[in-house]
Amino acid sequence: MKSSGKHIHKALSFLLAVTMITGLLFISGCGNDMPAADGNDTDAPYKTAAEEFFLDRGDGTYTLTEAVYPKDYDGPMPLVAIAHGFKGTLNSGGAEELSHRLAEAGYAAVRMDFNPSIAPKKNADKTNLYDLKSMEADMLRAVNYMIGHHSIDTDRLGLYARSMGGGVAMTMANENSGGFDFKAVALVAPAGTDDAMVYYMGGDESWEEMKKTAREDGFIEHQGQKLTPEWFKEFEDYNPCDFGYKFADKPVLVICNTLDYVVTDETSRKCAAAYKNSRVIEVTTDNYHGYEMSYENSELKDYLMSELIDFFKDNL
């Protein structure tokens, strides 16, 4: 009987051990079967899609535009409209890479080439004629296109711009351009003061001489761009820094470079100071006006783009 009791005890111990192991295996297996978190709450990057198209400007010219957005986004997407600067293109300053990074983070991005094409074809000639007002109009056409063709959350619209485009973005934010309530603005080297472009053109005397030629000849060509009398007038008629108060306490991020001599860090800081709720990131790089953002590999680029993504995550 004693021997039988020992066997029973061993059998019970074995069954208990098996039961415990089975239970542990079951619990471990259940971990993989838990419901996934909502797709918009995960930190995993979205797969992205890109769409290239031309926007009709209504005057026989067209704006080359590209939208990049997250695939399979659940619900209306936040949107960031992107503006380049003087002489730039839709891919200037790393804008293409930034667009894809935004889309991976769950944000639609739309950017355009402000230099109009004479036909809706990529190899079509350019007019080399654009100014602040036409840039603003292009931005609004792009935003409205996105709203009309994609599911966009119009309560989560942001602006990103650099250099001359920075002044355009400041104006749009200040004035609720197009009736939109832009929620956040990020600027790299914004030419948004009353003297930023005067400085870029060589100072007051050079500015006045260029204006005179534009009046007499209809335009003056500078660095491949045709500057009309209206081009000069628009800079003189509206100083975005004077109206930053209209943006109230909505957030503005300004990035400047101590070695930038195209748009100086002093100019960038003046733009930041025009807003109640602004933050400045100051860098130092020999890539004076590019900020290394178009480099294939750059720690500075990665840092700045991460800061930009985080800024829009926090504020859109």
What are these regions (language model features)?
Residues F247-A248, L253-C256:
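Short beta-strand/loop motif that positions the catalytic acidic residue
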Residues Y261-T267:
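Conserved alpha/beta-hydrolase "acid-adjacent" motif
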